[in-house]
Amino acid sequence: VPNFNMDIIKDIEKSLNLNFGNWTLVQSLENSGGTEVPLPKEKIGGSEVLLPKKEFQALDLFDYIYAVLHSPSYREKYKEFLKIDFPRVPYPKPETFWQLVSLGGKLRSLHLLEDTSLDERIIDIKGEGELLIKNSLNKKDFSIEDEKVELRLNDEVSVVNIPLVAWEFYIGGYQPAQKWLKDRVGRVLNRADMKHYNRIINALCKTDLIMKKIDEVL
């Protein structure tokens, strides 16, 4: 059950000129049939146009907040404040609310690794032998060329074509693309592990693109 301050919800209703629905987050997901909640559309002049909803649900508000918190300009503007207190999210504006809801929903789907587009192959394996992470994965164990990273797992096998943007991407205080591998030093990776890692890399790349789109909307 969403734990919202209803006084704030009433202010948001006024800001958007919309009523707040009574679906829980789970009901929102169930009624949408998936992770990402689709917005209503109508064909006008041969093209699909997003239509405004008559009310917003808890998940819509969650996705709006999630989008704002992933805005690079928002993070830069409030970075000192965010170090000492909870984030302050601006009240939504009618002209941008649903765009941010859509982008936030896409981010949520990516970060839950449920987006089907994440299966697109990005990384490759170079060399022959078992995928034993023998090296400590320090700077000497990887090289960068044409914005792509080659990571040497051991003397025989490397992971190649890791996009630099994903390799250097931070979430919180760590870099997922690097931490995931470092946490597995000494282990032999299998096909399922590499498929999962490819999905992580894909999610990080797509997150970077969506964050830029969020800034364009804000």
Q: Where are the predicted features?
A:
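Sequence-level detector for compositionally biased, low-complexity segments
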Residues: V1-L218
